Amino acid sequence: MTTAALKRDEILLLFDVDGTLTMPRSVVTPEFEEFFYSRVKPRATIGIVGGSDLEKMFEQLNGRKILNEFDFIFPENGLVQIEGGKEVGKQNIIMHLGEETVKRFINFVLRYLSELDVPIKRGTFIEFRNGMMNVCPIGRQCTREERNMFAEYDIEHKVREKMIKDLKQEFADVDLTYSIGGQISFDVFPHGWDKTYCLRHIEAHYKFKEIHFFGDKTEPGGNDYEIYSDPRTISHRVYTPKDTQRILTEILEL
């Protein structure tokens, strides 16, 4: 049986946000929204799984209406689980690691960043979330132009890659995973708390015949890698919403 022949409740389509439903840190276009909600949603169960918190998902996907449009929303790699617009579960990194370890990590990162020489620095260098910490060497309060500039700088100088290497050495005694996502930051979370975490919730409550995942950061070290390479998913590497639309049109025969 082809994917297109499956009933809506037999297939789940899971999507990353940046580079998949939107361009990086941009808002979804009206054209893509129209295609997605009018043609894809009637054909398949739909969900989003992102590293960002729910508020950032609201910003990029045109507000709180996604609570009604998506069957599943998994912010913070699925450490927060939302079904039918209601939160049904949440995990907490402080309870898992302990306050002393979290404090030690944050203190080290702040010292490290204070001595790091990058072209610009702005504000919000560490963002604390339920299931992870997000570290941004230039600060998340940068403009879009500054974000793009750092992304190019990082390709050449590998700022994030080098910092992760140093953190792995310093915190070898702590069960932490480091994952580069987006243009300017990286996520830090306990082992196994990557995007595959959402599959635990899905498998515990549902029996889909196929689970498809769409994402862009699918290389080792990228924040889509674990779920992209998981045998439970049929995965599709994309780089833009146009790629996503093209593949959806093909597999659902729209």
Curated annotation (Swiss-Prot):
It is an enzyme of class 5 (isomerase). The keyword Translocase does not apply. GO terms for biological process: cellular response to hypoxia; GDP-D-mannose biosynthetic process from fructose-6-phosphate; GDP-mannose biosynthetic process from mannose; mannose metabolic process; protein N-linked glycosylation. The active site is at 16 (nucleophile), 18 (proton donor/acceptor). Keywords: Cytoplasm, Isomerase, Magnesium, Metal-binding. Gene3D superfamilies: 3.30.1240.20, HAD superfamily/HAD-like. Its EC number is 5.4.2.8. Belongs to the eukaryotic PMM family. Homodimer. This is Phosphomannomutase. It comes from Drosophila melanogaster.
